[in-house]
Amino acid sequence: MLIEVVKSKIHRVRVTGADLDYIGSITLDPELIEAASLVIGEKVQVVNINNGERMETYVIAGDRGSGEVTLNGPAARKVQKGDIVIVIGYALLEIEEAKKFSPAIIFPDEATNKLI
């Protein structure tokens, strides 16, 4: 049997933009993507600390070192620039594998979204 577990978590980053006219997704600095063991195109959940909204989208890469966290398409209506969000990726694992699994959880600087 498979269970869904947290695989990756970017804890408390500041939204740098919201682009309603973009096709969709969340644009992230590749440094954040790599540190959290996320993959381009991976489905993620985004939780907005400011308003309680939860949404699903997928990851695309922005400019390296930019600290970018931009919600695109319909998700742009759920955030405002400056909001604090958590980005979570999940994985399906066998129960025994899940018991031993350790997720990649990162805590970037909340003001700059840079890795600490």
List the predicted regions and their residue ranges.
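Compact, glycine-rich, soluble single-domain proteins
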Residues: 3-5, 10, 14-99, 111-112
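Short, glycine/charged-enriched hinge/interface segments at domain edges or termini
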Residues: 102-105, 109-116
